[in-house]
Structures are given as structure tokens and as C-alpha cells.
Curated annotation (Swiss-Prot):
Classification via InterPro entries: Caveolin
Protein name stated in the entry: Caveolin-2
GO BP, sorted A to Z: caveola assembly; endoplasmic reticulum organization; insulin receptor signaling pathway; mitochondrion organization; negative regulation of endothelial cell proliferation; positive regulation of dopamine receptor signaling pathway; regulation of cytosolic calcium ion concentration; skeletal muscle fiber development
Originating organism: Echinops telfairi
Modified residues (Phosphoserine): 20, 23, 36
Cytoplasmic side stretches: 1-86, 108-162
Family: Belongs to the caveolin family.
Length: 162
């Protein structure tokens, strides 16, 4: 699960007429690598991270650099993105996966053994609390509010201009 059984052969294309519609880095046999292996993002959680060179760097029609500079910068962008991602995942993927596993295990344990029993207990006790609260409001708060209302209803103010 997640282990690579084949090595990916990578080629860099830098021909003048195909650079604008090509991503720069490509698999030698793209159909072999796209069809094999499980989908690592089946729910498309990281579909927003599929950025290309044109999504990051763009030159308007009025200002263009030399074609060779554009092609080389495109190739360097794609290669550095590819190599740096591989380098970072080589060093960070296992420790971060371990830390995320610990975090999710702790959160799951807290949710299962503390939060949900507390919520269920509150929901179970709630009808009793509701009955007690209704009795307290009927016995204490309702007469108090009624007497205050009657006291203030007999107050009348008259303003006179002297």
C-alpha cells in the first residue's frame, strides 16, 4: 500500500513549438504510470494544488521575455518543483504521517471515550433538568415578574412645563 513497484522515467522536453502547451516534465510512458497503482487522492482533497507554470508565472502580451529564457525558466520551475517535492516528502512524510496519526488517535479517543459519553449523559439528564427548571420558573421567577409588572403598571408619569 503506497509502495512504488516501478521507477518513473522522466524526460524534459524543451522544443520551441511545444513548450506552451506542455508542462515541461513528463513520463516517458504516461499511460503506463497513470493507469497503474491506486489513486492516492480518490476524494480529490488536493485538487487545488495542481498548478502549472502558467498558473504561477504569466507574461502579458505587451511584455515578453526571450523565448529561450521562457522555455528555460519553465523547465527549471517544473524540475525544481518535482525535485524539491520529492526531497521534502523523503524527509518529512514519515514524521508528519506519524504525528498526524498520533493526533488523530488522540482526538478519536477523546471523542469516543469523553465527548460522546458526556453529550449522551447531558441529553439523558436534560428532561429531568427541564422539569426542574420549569418548576423553578413557575414557583420563583413567574410570581416575581408578575409582581414587578403590577408594581410598574400602576406608576404614571405626568410631565408639566413650568
Amino acid at each position: 500500500m503506497g509502495l512504488e513497484s516501478e521507477k518513473a522515467d522522466v524526460q524534459l522536453f524543451m522544443d520551441d513549438d511545444a513548450y506552451s502547451r506542455h508542462s515541461g516534465v513528463d513520463f516517458v510512458e504516461a499511460e503506463k504510470f497513470s493507469a497503474s497503482g491506486p489513486d492516492r487522492d480518490p476524494h480529490r482533497l488536493n485538487s487545488h494544488l495542481q498548478l502549472g507554470f502558467q498558473d504561477v508565472i504569466a507574461e502579458p502580451e505587451t511584455t515578453h521575455s526571450f523565448d529561450k529564457v521562457w522555455i528555460c525558466s519553465h523547465a527549471l520551475f517544473e524540475i525544481s518543483k518535482y525535485v524539491l517535492y520529492k526531497f521534502l516528502t523523503f524527509f518529512l512524510a514519515i514524521p508528519l504521517a506519524f504525528a498526524a496519526g498520533i493526533l488523530f488517535a488522540i482526538l478519536s479517543c477523546l471523542h469516543i471515550w469523553i465527548i460522546m459519553p458526556f453529550v449522551k449523559t447531558c441529553l439523558m439528564v436534560l428532561p429531568s433538568v427541564q422539569t426542574i427548571w420549569k418548576s423553578v420558573t413557575d414557583v420563583v421567577i413567574a410570581p416575581l415578574c408578575t409582581s414587578v409588572g403590577r408594581s410598574f403598571s400602576s406608576v404614571s408619569l405626568q410631565l408639566s412645563q413650568d
